[in-house]
Swiss-Prot record:
Domain text: The similarity among the IL-1 precursors suggests that the amino ends of these proteins serve some as yet undefined function.
Family: Belongs to the IL-1 family.
UniProt name for this protein: Interleukin-1 alpha
Annotated organism of origin: Mus musculus
Residue numbers bearing the Phosphoserine modification: S90
The keyword Glycoprotein is annotated on this UniProt entry: yes
Gene disruption: observed consequences: Deletion mice show reduced nociceptive sensitivity compared to control mice in models of inflammatory and nerve injury-induced pain when associated with IL1B deletion.
Keywords: Acetylation, Cytokine, Cytoplasm, Glycoprotein, Inflammatory response, Mitogen, Nucleus, Phosphoprotein, Pyrogen, Secreted
Length: 270
């Protein structure tokens, strides 16, 4: 088992001969800042470069210092201040050689908020205003028509020969009392109680059956709200629950949410 690396020997070399090493360590402890973090303190650029390139074989000594906190964040930065890697360690844990190699050489996994809804939107209240469009058809930029899947839960696109299969929509306008530049709406399949709802990036939109057209939409129900924007003859629908995502299509595939290309996000309404 390899021990938690001691980088104090390396930090000593970063101070000039005229500087008091022990007083620097005391100052560091009082402020409870990690000595591992190259972004703290007044270390020279050469020290930062040395820290980034440390190998576990060079840092196998035990530390004789006592820390008030049981956890420390280890991070490495480049010379221009960009964080290259970051780890949170516990001094109560033992580490294998593989653990230390991973900390030294591997970048921390990035958490992708691809499907996380915009949480502050749950505080908004959308009140039903009026029916603005009825029994209209939406075609994408490839002139594909939207139709309902056999399972009735999803929408797909293709070039239809039988236009009786194309889906017609009703659009209801809502008011949130918030940003006047946005136009919140719901999309309902005509002659039904099936409403289009968002599920996340690259996920198909889901058809939710509701007993009636909702008069007030709040909280988790904001997946029913889309912001309608019309530019010339192109129409866009941005999700209120996922503000960076649009209702989108691909060639002969399910209608889904996407940021843009390779998906198509503009529609013709007729």
């Amino acid at each position: 088992m390899a021990k938690v690396p001691d980088l104090f020997e390396d930090l000593k070399n970063c101070y000039s001969e005229n500087e008091d090493y022990s007083s620097a360590i005391d100052h560091l402890s009082l402020n409870q800042k990690s000595f591992y973090d190259a972004s703290y303190g007044s270390l020279h650029e050469t020290c930062t470069d040395q820290f980034v390139s440390l190998r576990t074989s060079e840092t196998s000594k035990m530390s004789n210092f006592t820390f008030k906190e049981s956890r420390v964040t280890v991070s490495a930065t480049s010379s221009n201040g960009k964080i290259l890697k970051k780890r949170r360690l516990s001094f109560s844990e033992t580490f294998t050689e593989d653990d230390l190699q991973s900390i030294t050489h591997d970048l921390e996994e990035t958490i992708q908020p691809r499907s996380a809804p915009y949480t502050y939107q749950s505080d908004l209240r959308y009140k039903l205003m009026k029916l603005v469009r009825q029994k209209f058809v939406m075609n994408d930029s490839l002139n594909q028509t939207i139709y309902q899947d056999v399972d009735k839960h999803y929408l797909s696109t293709t070039w239809l020969n039988d236009l009786q299969q194309e889906v017609k929509f009703d659009m209801y306008a809502y008011s949130s009392g918030g940003d006047d530049s946005k136009y919140p709406v719901t999309l309902k399949i005509s002659d039904s109680q099936l409403f289009v709802s968002a599920q996340g990036e690259d996920q198909p939109v889901l058809l939710k059956e509701l007993p009636e057209t909702p008069k007030l939409i709040t909280g988790s129900e904001t997946d029913l709200i889309f912001f309608w924007k019309s530019i010339n003859s192109k129409n866009y629908f941005t999700s209120a629950a996922y503000p960076e995502l649009f209702i989108a299509t691909k060639e002969q595939s399910r209608v889904h949410l996407a940021r843009g290309l390779p998906s198509m996000t503009d529609f013709q309404i007729s």
